[in-house]
Structures are given as structure tokens and as C-alpha cells.
Amino acid sequence: MTIKIHNTLSNKKEEFYPQRGNFVSMYVCGITPYDEVHLGHARVYVVFDIVKRHLLRRGYIVKHIQNFTDVDDKIVKRSQEKNMKPSELAQIYIEDYFVQAGRLNILKAEKYPCVTQMIPEIVNFIKELVNKGLAYEIGGDIYFSVEKFKDYGKLSKRNLKDLRAGARVGVCNGKNSAFDFALWKKTKENEPREVTWESPWGKGRPGWHIECSAMSSELLGDTIDIHGGGQDLIFPHHENEIAQSEAKTGKKFVKYWIHNGFVTINKEKMSKSLNNFFTLKAIFEKYNPRVVRYYLLTQHYSSPLDFSDAGIESARNTLQGMDGTYLRLISSVKESDVEITDKDLSDLQGNFLSALDDDFNSEKALSYLHELKGLISKGLLTAGRERLSQLKKLFEDFAGTSLGILLPEEQNADESLQNLLKERNDARKNKNWAESDRVRKLIIDERGYKIFDNKDGSSLLVKKV
């Protein structure tokens, strides 16, 4: 068993060897909480949830840090529009993140640092860069000198010469280079007091890029095993993180960089200007979060993902069928604390785990889950209890532990619905088809359940997703 990761830095698939045995440090760039969480965010955090789940499944200990950029120009602007304190606005959308992430069944990080909680650490980081001659001050603003870091552009495969040739902007504000970026921003007129902190260079607040470097080094050390986010962060954000971190420490900042592909909506880029920008809250009014999570797993994380009505409906129907198969299985056998001894199931388990070992290929892993579903359907007709117990264990391992899409137990139907189901089954036995159809319509249309009829005459109810 060796996990392989496509490393953005080398643009190659590399074998995964963390720095310290089975301990893995992982830093994922979090949201800027000025608006509701959207579909693009969902893909990032589901992708890294699969990474974390598989690392845990393979026996690693994972220290996962995910930040909140809770001070930012967008937060200040939006809070002023809403006549709120920036901290109040940020807290609203931080809470929204946790609600929507919970609905997507995303495992929690070990820590969620906020920028406003780590200003002293950020200031100290900047001071070291200034003291080493890697950053300079202009009127209370501090800039990182990109020219001082010879490897600038190695993540995004750019170089300063090409950047200069393609640049449309000249040097402004007295900067040494147009590509030097802000580490500390002097307080502007009319900015709220609560986004202003004292520093050796006067009152101000951190720039965006320095925040992640300072927080990650404080909580995970100078070198991180895994770092990543969406592809849009490769340049300039992650490029600048590398520059300031490696310039400060002289050490490799990140061993393995992981970036997920963009989300499009019906083949168009998701954006507010095109009116195809969907918050998770709005999507979840129409689609079950489990369906959305399943759909996000149907493509390899590095590929673009098109979110379409046809695609999500297909995912809904597929997941509904899986739920029905699983409910039939758990109605036939309760035990799952068994060893996988049947060779075909052991081989299938190996194939499933190997798919995730190979750069966390959820698309391929799902194909083995579907293969398992077929074996369960066949087993329900012919298999004994031991075989069914193994099938149940494997399904819960694949769909639950690894992929996070297993039907929750609380979705079982309540007593009133079971009574309606009994009425329908009695009507069917008596060949009272009109009454059977009436109750069926009541269960499906008014109570939101699907009915799965078994060959032995019994039926199961599954909450529609």
C-alpha cells in the first residue's frame, strides 16, 4: 500500500511519504466569510474530506488545519453596506460554513484559526522578513520583495521575466517591482477600528498571503506535508505563500500541493455576473446534501466538474437506488463486525482502496461501490447470513467510512408511515389496486418516500433524496 499524489509543484504523481512516520500535517485554505458558502467552496472541502478520510483509513494520524480569513477588504466593504461590525458579519458566515459543511458530512478540522486571533504571530513573521532584507516599508505599508526569492513562480510554472513582459501595470506606490505584494497594509481613512492593529510600522492589518504562511507555520511547523485548495489559488496566493515562507525559513514550505478543478454550471463558469452563482443553502432547498456530495465525487478532483440539472438528477436516482439496496440488506442482516474472508469481496476491497491510493480517485472508487451494490442485490436472493454480513461491512466501509455518503440511520420511516405501508401491502394482497395506488401516492407525494417492493411480498420505505 503506497498512496500516490499528483503534486502541483512537480506536475507529477509522487509516492506519499510524510515527514514524520504516520503523522500527516495538512493545511487547507478556508473561506473569506463575507457571503454564504457556495458550490465552489463545497467542492474544495469535499475533496479534502476524501483526502483526510482515506489517510485515516490507511492508518495515518492527520492534523488538519483550515483557516478563516476573517479580516479582508470584502468583509469591511460588506459590513459597511450592512451597517454591521466586520466581526459580526464574519461570524454570521463562519456559522453558515459549519452548518453547510455539516450537511455535506465533512469531517471537522482539528483547528480553525482566524486571522484576527493570530495578529501577533503574523506581525512577528513580517518582522523577520523585514529584518532579513526580504521586505521593505513604504509609508506604513510593508511589501515582500519578489526579486529576492529566486524560485518565484515555481508552483505556477511562471518566471518573473515572462511576468514582466506580460504585465500591463507599471510600478506604483513606490514599490520596487509591480509584482511585490503587501504583507501589511496601513490603516485607511474611515476604516473600522476593529480591523486595525498596532505594529512596528504603525496601525494596519495583514495582507492576504502572509496570513496563511504565519498561521500554518505556527500550528504545523515550517514544512507541511499537504497544502492546497482550488486551482484559482495557485497564483498568486500559493505562489506568494511559498516565496515568503521559504525566504524566511530556508526550508521547503510544502511537500505535496493538491489543487482541485473548477466548477461550471451547465458548461458555463460559475459567476454572479452570469446569474448562475448558487449558494449551498439555495441548492439544498432543491437537492439533498448527500446527492450533492455524491455528485461532487463523480469526477476526479483535478478535473473540471460541470454541475447540471441532468447530472444532479442522475446522481439523485443513483443514490436512491443505493439507499434501497442498503435498506434491503440491513433488513436481512444486522451484523457487520466480521472479517472479509470471501476472496471476491477481499479483492473488491483491495481494488476500492487502491483507487483511492491512486491520487484519491473517487470516480474510480465509486465504480467499485456500484460493483458491490450488484453483488448485494444478487446476495439478497441467494446468499447466507455470513456472506450478507460481509457485504454489509464492505458497503458501510465504502459508502460510509471512505466516501461519506451512507444513508443515515435516522432516515428510517416513522410508525405512521409503516402503518400506511401495511395498508398498501394489505390492499395488494387483496388485489384492491385502487386502494393500493391511493396509499402509494400518499406515501410518495405527500410524505416524500419511495417504496421498494421485495420479491417475498414485503416492502421498504426510503426517504427521497
From Swiss-Prot:
A motif ('KMSKS' region) lies at residues 269-273. Its EC number is 6.1.1.16. It catalyses: tRNA(Cys) + L-cysteine + ATP = L-cysteinyl-tRNA(Cys) + AMP + diphosphate. Signal peptide: none annotated. ATP binds at residue 272. Transmembrane segments: none annotated. Pfam families: DALR_2 (PF09190), tRNA-synt_1e (PF01406). Keywords: Aminoacyl-tRNA synthetase, ATP-binding, Cytoplasm, Ligase, Metal-binding, Nucleotide-binding, Protein biosynthesis, Zinc. The keyword ATP-binding applies. It is found in: Cytoplasm. A motif ('HIGH' region) lies at residues 31-41. Gene3D superfamilies: Cysteine-tRNA ligase, C-terminal anti-codon recognition domain, HUPs. Zn(2+) binds at residues 29, 212, 237, 241. It comes from the Bacteria. InterPro entries: Cys-tRNA-ligase (IPR015803), Cys-tRNA-synt_Ia_DALR (IPR015273), Cys-tRNA/MSH_ligase (IPR024909), Rossmann-like_a/b/a_fold (IPR014729), tRNA-synt_1_cat_dom (IPR032678), tRNAsynth_Ia_anticodon-bd (IPR009080). Belongs to the class-I aminoacyl-tRNA synthetase family. This is Cysteine--tRNA ligase. It comes from Endomicrobium trichonymphae. The gene is cysS.
